[in-house]
Amino acid sequence: ADDSDPVGGEFLAEGGGVR
């Protein structure tokens, strides 16, 4: 995942969105 947008759901574990 990325450290940009909290979109995708992975932002809770990765720190960003999976976009």
Swiss-Prot record:
Any Gene Ontology biological process: innate immune response
Q: What's this protein's function?
A: Cleaved by the protease thrombin to yield monomers which, together with fibrinogen beta (FGB) and fibrinogen gamma (FGG), polymerize to form an insoluble fibrin matrix. Fibrin has a major function in hemostasis as one of the primary components of blood clots. In addition, functions during the early stages of wound repair to stabilize the lesion and guide cell migration during re-epithelialization. Was originally thought to be essential for platelet aggregation, based on in vitro studies using anticoagulated blood.
Q: Which GO terms describe its cellular component?
A: extracellular region
Organism of origin: Ovis aries (Sheep)
Task: Provide the alphabetized UniProt keywords.
Answer: Adaptive immunity, Blood coagulation, Coiled coil, Disulfide bond, Hemostasis, Immunity, Innate immunity, Secreted
Compartments reported by the entry: Secreted
Main localization (coarse): secreted
Q: Which chain positions lie within coiled-coil regions?
A: none
Q: How does it assemble?
A: Heterohexamer; disulfide linked. Contains 2 sets of 3 non-identical chains (alpha, beta and gamma). The 2 heterotrimers are in head to head conformation with the N-termini in a small central domain.
Task: Report the domain of life of the source organism.
Answer: Eukaryota
Q: What is this protein called?
A: Fibrinogen alpha chain
Supply the domain comment: A long coiled coil structure formed by 3 polypeptide chains connects the central nodule to the C-terminal domains (distal nodules). The long C-terminal ends of the alpha chains fold back, contributing a fourth strand to the coiled coil structure.
PTM comment: Conversion of fibrinogen to fibrin is triggered by thrombin, which cleaves fibrinopeptides A and B from alpha and beta chains, and thus exposes the N-terminal polymerization sites responsible for the formation of the soft clot. The soft clot is converted into the hard clot by factor XIIIA which catalyzes the epsilon-(gamma-glutamyl)lysine cross-linking between gamma chains (stronger) and between alpha chains (weaker) of different monomers. Forms F13A-mediated cross-links between a glutamine and the epsilon-amino group of a lysine residue, forming fibronectin-fibrinogen heteropolymers.
Underlying gene: FGA
